[in-house]
């Protein structure tokens, strides 16, 4: 049954309330107290449920918590699945009160998986940057996705620069596409979460830039803040190149001109993170759901879509060393799912690595994973559509 909670507060007329914080908790079937952030849409377990509320004033001070208790009977009005998919709210957490083993579901049938001619230039190693230096550099042509994710592990502020450099003897033109930036921040999960949603909701830029031989252009000029020690920054960007364009990722001391990046020493890659250039780094995945039972679509596993794709986790080359490299998580790879279903079907996103935050586009609508915070167990999911 739907829960509707109203509240009144006493406050100065002139003073705004910048933040309102709801939490709710209950005791699960194993006797554990479970607490979730946000306002519950409904209750899906019998017993006592507690909802708390606190508000923040204009000076940043939080009120004492107000508390409201509900006693929920054993009378089931609707299952969680029935309720969530009838009252669709993309981004909300699917609690999985019954602790259904979602990983035990049968894999859905992938009719085919096709790759797209997109080159991925990925800079994620060394993830922890101790000193200024060249993090990655290679030349790209045609459609390219650029990705980096680095943490300042030194003692002084750094800037991470994403640089386009024409090292040919002819003018080179490239077009800016979608882009998403995040950081600096101390929270790596927050950085990935913000970067992904900013990229997905960004519009195609369309700006054309022509570089003369030897000329450079700062691709991430929107990231102006220096990165303080222990903070990190990331970016994901698409470009379309006519000709051959060098792209470099460099860590530089604050105040250094990015155009002097060629004087920097090359920083060695550090496992387990990777860096490299990868061909055919975009997938279109076609799924046919027959509607008979719940099924799973597995992304990010080495054997995902085996029989349809030789190597799902892409391999490439570290252009700075010539060594073969493996993108163990398909970081920066754009994957599009095309799903056909025989019946009306609900979609849940279930992270298998426990604590997770992220975002997807579902039918061109941004869906946050989740809208109210981290997913903390492999039993929970997020309602996508």
Identify the role of each PLM range:
Residues 17-40:
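Surface-exposed, flexible coil segments in extracellular/virion-facing regions
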Residues 38-48:
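Solvent-exposed segments in extracellular or luminal domains encompassing
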Residues 56-61:
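Short, solvent-exposed loop/turn segments at the edges of extracellular beta-sandwich modules
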Residues 62-74:
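C-terminal edge beta-strand
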Residues 150-158, 163-183, 239-241, 340-352, ...:
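Asparagine-centered strand-capping/turn motif at beta-strand->loop junctions
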Residues 190-228, 364-385:
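Intrinsically disordered, low-complexity Pro/Gly/Ser/Thr-rich segments with frequent PxxP/GP/PP motifs
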Residues 225-263:
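Terminal connector regions
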């Amino acid at each position: 049954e739907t829960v509707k909670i109203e509240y009144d507060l006493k406050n100065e007329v002139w003073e705004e309330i910048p933040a309102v914080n709801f939490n709710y908790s209950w005791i699960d079937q194993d006797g554990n107290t479970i607490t979730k952030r946000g306002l519950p849409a409904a209750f899906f377990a019998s017993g006592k449920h507690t909802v708390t509320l606190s508000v923040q004033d204009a000076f940043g001070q939080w009120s004492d918590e107000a508390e409201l208790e509900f006693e929920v009977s054993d009378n089931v009005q609707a299952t969680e699945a029935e309720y969530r998919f009838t009252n669709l709210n993309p981004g909300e957490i699917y609690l999985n009160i019954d602790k259904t083993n979602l990983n035990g579901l049968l894999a859905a049938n992938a009719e085919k998986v096709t790759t797209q001619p997109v080159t991925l230039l990925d800079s994620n190693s060394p993830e922890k940057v101790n000193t200024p230096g060249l993090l990655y550099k290679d030349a790209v042509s045609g459609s390219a996705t650029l990705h980096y994710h680095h943490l300042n592990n030194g003692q002084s502020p750094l800037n991470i620069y994403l640089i386009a450099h024409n090292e040919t003897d002819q003018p080179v033109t490239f077009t800016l596409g979608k882009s998403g930036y995040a950081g600096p921040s101390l929270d790596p999960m927050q950085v990935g979460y913000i970067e992904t949603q900013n990229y997905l909701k960004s519009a195609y830029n369309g700006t054309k830039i022509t570089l003369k031989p030897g000329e450079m252009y700062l691709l991430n000029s929107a990231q102006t803040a220096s990165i303080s020690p222990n903070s990190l920054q990331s970016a994901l960007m698409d470009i379309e190149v006519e000709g051959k364009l060098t792209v470099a990722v460099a860590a530089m001391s604050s105040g250094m001109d990015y155009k002097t990046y060629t004087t920097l020493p090359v920083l060695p890659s550090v496992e387990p993170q990777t860096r490299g250039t990868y061909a055919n780094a975009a997938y279109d995945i076609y799924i046919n759901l027959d509607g008979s039972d719940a099924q799973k679509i597995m992304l990010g596993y080495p054997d995902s879509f085996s029989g349809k794709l030789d190597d799902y986790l892409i391999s490439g080359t570290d252009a700075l060393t010539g060594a073969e490299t493996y993108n163990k998580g398909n970081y920066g790879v754009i994957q599009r799912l095309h799903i056909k279903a025989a019946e009306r079907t609900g979609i849940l996103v279930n992270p298998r690595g426990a604590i997770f935050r992220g975002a997807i586009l579902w039918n061109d609508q941004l869906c946050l994973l989740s809208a109210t915070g981290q997913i903390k167990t492999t039993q929970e999911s997020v309602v996508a559509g």
